């Protein structure tokens, strides 16, 4: 991965949806074919995102992934359900949020137009790392938060970027690609920031 020892950095990786997994990739293509037909547009390549953050505390990988086993060694800080809340009672239908010290991004070799440096500010890196356990954990693949888009791994990453104070709207997807769920994270982050603003103003008066 990209960052060198002794530096602070936030790097974004774009991975083709289902990299290394043929069934996920096929399902993604079917989903995009249907979405493109409904929206009367051309089909796009679909991408999943992950972050590598280097700060004073070390190097961390931040990603949402299936919770297929106990997560202590992967720095799991939160879990959520896949499909329905009831399904989440079974481990097979759970996802996990990782803040993994010295971790790895699976299939990083297949990343496209990556890494993308978002910041080299130490305070921003620390703030983003502190935010990871606070991320919302709605049901994956559903729009429980009423954003107009389903919540998924891209929502996690865009939420963190927005909440950490970086310019999330300037983050471009790979050429010819889409990142379903990206907008959902931004919408929720902006809502939370708007709610916090009046409280901050009142407290300073």
Question: What are these model-derived regions, one by one?
Answer:
Residues 56-59, 162-170:
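Short helix-capping/linker segments at secondary-structure and domain boundaries
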């Amino acid at each position: 991965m990209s960052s060198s020892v002794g530096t602070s950095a936030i790097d974004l990786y774009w991975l083709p949806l289902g990299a290394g997994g043929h069934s996920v990739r096929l399902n993604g293509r079917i989903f995009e074919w249907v979405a493109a037909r409904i929206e009367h547009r051309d089909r796009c390549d679909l991408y999943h995102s992950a972050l590598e953050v280097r700060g004073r505390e070390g190097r961390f990988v931040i990603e949402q992934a299936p919770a297929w086993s106990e997560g202590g060694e992967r720095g799991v800080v939160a879990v959520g359900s896949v499909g329905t809340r009831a399904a989440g009672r079974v481990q097979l239908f759970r996802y996990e949020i990782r803040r993994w010290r010295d971790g790895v991004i699976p299939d990083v070799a297949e990343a496209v137009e990556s890494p993308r440096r978002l910041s080299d500010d130490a305070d921003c890196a620390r703030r983003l790392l502190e935010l990871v356990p606070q991320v919302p954990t709605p049901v994956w693949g559903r729009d429980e938060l009423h954003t107009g888009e389903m919540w998924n791994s891209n929502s996690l990453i865009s939420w963190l970027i927005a909440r950490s104070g970086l310019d999330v709207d300037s983050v471009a997807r790979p050429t010819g690609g889409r990142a379903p769920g990206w907008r959902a994270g931004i919408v929720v982050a902006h809502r939370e920031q708007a709610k916090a603003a009046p409280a901050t103003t009142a407290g300073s008066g």
